[in-house]
Design a protein with these regions (language model features):
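Conserved strand-helix element at the start of the C-terminal RecA-like helicase core
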Residues: 1-13
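C-terminal accessory/connector segments of nucleic-acid motor ATPases
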Residues: 189-223
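A glycine-rich phosphate-binding loop feature that marks nucleotide/adenosyl-phosphate handling sites
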Residues: 6-9, 183-187, 207-212
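Conserved phosphate-handling catalytic cores of large alpha/beta enzymes
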Residues: 18-200
């Protein structure tokens, strides 16, 4: 599961995967009508899904796939409308789907579960934690990995210059991966600052509303 912060980024990654010949699904606001189906099959063996951070929220990704959704897909492959299928056809499709999902679930478990990749850190630590929670749900195995660049909006606005200068002093080129506690702390500090700004903005809105509310109450009393 590859998670991006915007639709543009998700489509950009989709184009890169297409050039590499990697089969994948894209889940963003443009394809909201297929959201449930895409999320349901995101846990299948070998499945690659690109999603924005808001897409598919509140939906569990079942390792091995969702047998109910797969059963409908199997019927469509046979040219049968799931809503018009007979009871026997539904039962046969469900049995086949259960067998496929159970087998794939074991393969996915053996491979380490769902791998969640964040293409950048978000302004809110809460959203990052939600992404971490996508992998390893309900006792299943899973991993989460974030990739961060000094050119990301979060880094560029607040801490990018400092981190870039630090890396230049160390003598590390831009293609070398960095896993360092100092970088993580700087990221968290930037997120805290943004959260503080957002809190102050909401606080100011409430204060403005308190002033307007006095006028509103007087007008309502006059009416």
């Amino acid at each position: 599961l590859v998670v991006t912060v915007s639709i543009d980024n998700s489509e950009r990654i989709s184009r890169l995967l297409e050039k590499k010949g990697i089969t994948h699904s894209v889940l963003n606001a443009k394809f909201h009508e297929r959201e449930a189906q895409i999320v349901a099959q995101a846990g299948r063996e070998g499945a690659v899904t690109i999603a924005t951070n808001m897409a598919g929220r509140g939906t569990d990704i079942l390792l091995g796939g969702n047998p109910d959704v797969l059963a409908e897909d199997l019927l469509r492959e046979q040219g049968i409308d799931p809503e018009e299928a007979t009871a026997q056809q539904l039962a046969d499709a469900k049995a086949s789907a259960d067998e496929i999902c159970q087998k794939e679930r074991q393969h996915v478990l053996d491979a380490g579960g769902l791998c969640v990749i964040g293409t950048e850190r978000h302004e809110s630590r809460r959203i990052d934690n939600q992404l971490r929670g996508r992998g390893g749900r309900q006792g299943d195995p899973g991993i989460t990995q974030f990739f961060v660049s000094c050119e990301d909006d979060l880094m560029r606005i607040f801490q990018g210059n400092q981190i870039g200068a630090m890396l230049n002093r160390i003598g590390i080129d831009e293609d070398t991966p960095i896993q360092n506690r100092s970088v993580t702390k700087m990221l968290e500090a930037a997120q805290k600052r943004i959260e503080g700004f957002n809190f102050d903005s909401r606080k100011n809105v409430v204060q403005y509303d308190n002033v307007i509310n006095r006028h509103r109450r007087i007008v309502y009393l006059m009416r």
